[in-house]
Regions:
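Short internal beta-strands
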Residues: 94-105, 315-321, 351-358
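A glycine- and small/hydrophobic-rich beta-loop-beta segment
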Residues: 247-349
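Short glycine-rich or small-residue beta-strand-to-loop segments that form or flank ligand, phosphate
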Residues: 62-73, 98-104, 280-282
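Internal helix-turn-beta structural module
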Residues: 341-401, 405
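N-terminal amphipathic/basic leader segments beginning at the initiator methionine
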Residues: 1-44
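Histidine-anchored nucleotide/phosphate-binding helix
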Residues: 73-92, 298-310
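A glycine-rich helix N-cap at a beta->alpha junction
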Residues: 114-139, 340-341, 345-348, 358-359
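Conserved, well-structured core segments that form the ligand-binding/active-site neighborhood
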Residues: 124-275
Length: 406
């Protein structure tokens, strides 16, 4: 049996031995909207829990729009024009619009990358800036979270009359689901805020899990959102594996996000017969598999669940292009010292992790006790040989999947 798995900007052909017990686990997000521009306009003009965007923007001189960075497949090329049209209809001039790229602690984006995600029509006409999480001059302190985490946000936001948060919804290994006020925290917040929030995943009992929205991280983010002293409007979308917009939700950041998550839960959740001996977790293609750091989203779709999809004595194969290697988040200047430290809690939940990618160096993998294979077929053959009649799960779009065992 041969299947095509998302890999970088293309697909990778992977052959599975016919004698193996293979279970295919893939969500169905549905077809893309026939007219996404009309869909976006409709939800911006008929939002959930708030006035239409144009009404809120009327009289505003400065508006900040927060967008996702290159590591997310958010269709900003479609979303930005829809938002900007409403702002112009309200009388906001192009000079008054600032687009802030929510890179969080990731590397900043190049001009070419910015043009790619916002579109050639937007980039030269509107100001687009990378967030700077480590530069105090670019940050404004706005208080503390309920747990005492210092809250800071990009200064462009607080100097605006209105902020528009954009993003897409997917299962998230710490927040439960992405989107909502997460576009503020951690996307455009200071490094102390980012570290404080991510430390919540280390709380005893691992209360922050994939696909569970009721958790300390999300509660903290949602409590911090109203600290931002600017009226905030949200636009979140649900996309399918082809990066097409399926549904769109706009309005009050809490209410619109809750509606978007409820829709995503129905589409992302897939029943799984039982925990497997071997799980092949695909990185989901570009940009989800841009680096091994982003590959954590595929790995946690297997292990960071109330009921992990791999047995305690099982193995996980992580497949992705990982064109940027480990990612800028590791090593000097990064948020993590090394791979072994960053992934320690995940690695202890399985016998072995094997990475399949030509772009990840051997040394940091070996130092973390992670195996490496030249091909998916080699990894499958090697892992399956350790079991008698192994049960194998294949998750082509692991970062977008919530597998539920009985």
């Amino acid at each position: 049996m041969t299947k095509q798995l998302p890999y970088g900007r293309a697909t990778l052909s992977v052959s599975f031995p016919e004698d193996l017990n293979v279970e295919w686990v893939q969500p169905d997000y549905g077809p893309g909207a026939p007219d996404p521009s009309a869909l976006l306009a409709e939800c911006l003009r008929n939002p959930i829990g708030s006035r239409p965007l144009a009404d809120q923007a009327r009289g505003a001189k400065r508006v900040a729009i927060v967008i996702d960075d290159i590591t997310r497949p958010t269709p900003s090329r479609l979303m930005l024009p829809a938002v900007i049209r409403e702002l112009h209809a309200a009388g906001v001039a192009a000079e008054g619009i600032r687009i802030v790229v929510g890179v969080g602690s990731h590397r900043t984006m190049t001009p070419a990358e910015i043009a790619e995600i916002v579109g050639e029509d937007i980039f030269p006409r509107y100001t687009v800036v990378n967030h700077q999480a480590r530069d105090p001059q670019h940050l404004a302190d706005i208080g503390r979270s309920p747990r005492g985490i210092p809250a800071s946000v990009n200064r462009t936001i607080v100097e605006s009359d209105l902020a528009v948060l954009t993003g897409f919804i997917k299962p998230h290994n710490v927040a439960g689901y992405s989107g909502g006020y997460k576009a503020y925290f951690p996307a455009v917040s200071g490094i102390d805020t980012i570290v404080g929030l991510h430390d919540l995943q280390k709380l005893p009992g691992e209360p922050c899990r994939l696909g569970e929205i009721d958790n300390p991280f999300r509660a903290e983010v949602d409590a911090m959102g109203p600290l931002v002293p600017v009226p905030t409007f949200l636009l979140n979308v649900v996309i399918n594996r082809h990066k097409q917009i399926v549904r769109a939700f706009a309005g009050d950041p809490r209410q619109a996000h809750q509606a978007a998550v409820a829709e995503t839960v129905k589409r992302a959740t897939v029943p799984v017969s039982q925990p497997a001996d071997v799980v092949l977790a695909g990185g989901g293609g570009y940009p989800s598999d841009i680096s091994l750091y982003q590959g954590i989203n595929a790995l946690t779709s297997v292990v960071r669940l109330r009921k992990p999809l791999v047995k305690e004595d099982g193995q996980v194969i992580l497949l992705g292009e990982f064109r940027e290697g480990l990612g800028s988040e590791f090593g000097s200047g990064g948020r993590h010292k090394d791979l072994a430290t960053a992934w320690a809690s995940h690695l202890k939940k399985m016998r072995r992790l094997t990475v399949v990618s030509p772009n990840v160096p051997h040394e940091p993998l070996a130092a973390a006790g992670i195996a490496r294979a030249q091909s998916a077929e080699e990894a499958i053959r090697r892992c399956a040989a350790d079991y008698r009649n192994p049960h194998i799960l294949v998750m082509p779009d692991a970062p977008y999947t919530v597998g539920l065992t009985g």
